[in-house]
Amino acid sequence: MLSKQKTKNRKGIEDAEIGDSYTFVGLDADSKLILAHHVGQRTALHTDAFVEKLDRATGGRFQLTTDGFNAYPDAIAYHLGTRTDYATLVKEFGTESEEERRYSPPRIIAATKTVIHGEPDEARICTSYVERVNLDVRMKCRRFTRLTNAFSKVWRNHRAAVALTVAHYNLCTMHRTIRMTPATKAGLVNRPWSVGDLLAA
């Protein structure tokens, strides 16, 4: 959230720089590397900007899974369509009380896999890895903490904080599954970086 959504609503402010923000994340399931991210809003325009970044960050043919947000299929078809095997995974959540919803995510009661184009391997239609990374980012970046006053006040600062968090995750964070940093696994660097390395880059 940038500034305060409640203030924006109360004062009738029409300013795209105030209100909710959304962070798109593209993750490689094998190396756990965050390939691309985009801080904006959950709209078709920002979805297209994110998928364009993902297009620039990847090469060759690969399998892609997203949630059911309706802006993804057109953006992916335009930027990545000829080289992706694309499916969606839509999760259905149970009904929780308002109090439960404030402090924890609702319970998943069903999940539906849908092939959009290409020939994705059904066993690899999964959003669990990126959901785990989303949790990591939320835990590492105070600005994502819910129900606090730690939200960002300025877009520029928020984008910078997210970029630094992503860079630290890719280059400095040892991943338990692969036993190295994602950037090392992907062959981008030959050793884990320290925070000093990151700040000096």
Give residue ranges: language-model regions.
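Residue-level recognition of single "structural anchor" positions
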Residues: 1-201
